[in-house]
Amino acid sequence: MKNKMKVVLADTDESFRMMLQRMIEAAGDFRVVGSVGSGADAWYVIERECPQLVIMDVILPELDGFGLLDRMAAMAARPRAILVSAFCQGQVVSRAMTQGAESFLPKPCEVNELLGQMRHVAQRAEAEDARNAALERLVTPVIHEVGMPAHIKGYQYVREAIILTIKDATMINAVTKVLYPTVA
């Protein structure tokens, strides 16, 4: 990892959060930018700090883990999420993964296992960033080749639409219903 990944911790158990923060920062790969005890506070910190990773419990006051996952899914730079919870029935785990969680660990968990999951998420994020940059480098010359200069107002939208369509070819069949709203 080039830069330390920014992490937010959200759990009602303050002693667990403090222990986790110490262990995460001691590992050296990550920087904890927020440690909070409620979903509403977590959302505030996520909006302010733009972390790459959120480690949270499902059960949080004011806004639960599922609500946070929903809100994070709507963000342009969506942070990745690892859920750590004692409430780990099959339906809960399935719903968390469906809503975009990267991983779900039962509480109590081994800190080394969590750190391993965090590193795995960081590696996947780095690989995805590299793929996106490579795709952008491929698309940009094609746009120039068809004669669209970069200073035109809709240039960024066109480039984004092409990249989204390359990533998900089904979007080409629903340009006005899916592609346009996604780009906008």
Model-derived features with residue positions:
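Short hydrophobic/Thr-rich beta-strand motif most characteristic of the beta2 strand and flanking loop
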Residues: 11, 29-37, 45
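Active-site residues of response regulator receiver
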Residues: 11, 57-58, 85
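C-terminal output/effector regions of signal-responsive regulators
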Residues: 130-184
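Active-site beta3 strand of CheY-like receiver
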Residues: 49-55, 60
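C-terminal output helix
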Residues: 91, 109-118
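The feature encodes the CheY-like receiver
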Residues: 61, 89
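A short, hydrophobic beta-strand element within the central beta-sheet of small alpha/beta folds
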Residues: 78-88
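Acidic catalytic/metal-coordinating carboxylates
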Residues: 38-41, 64-67
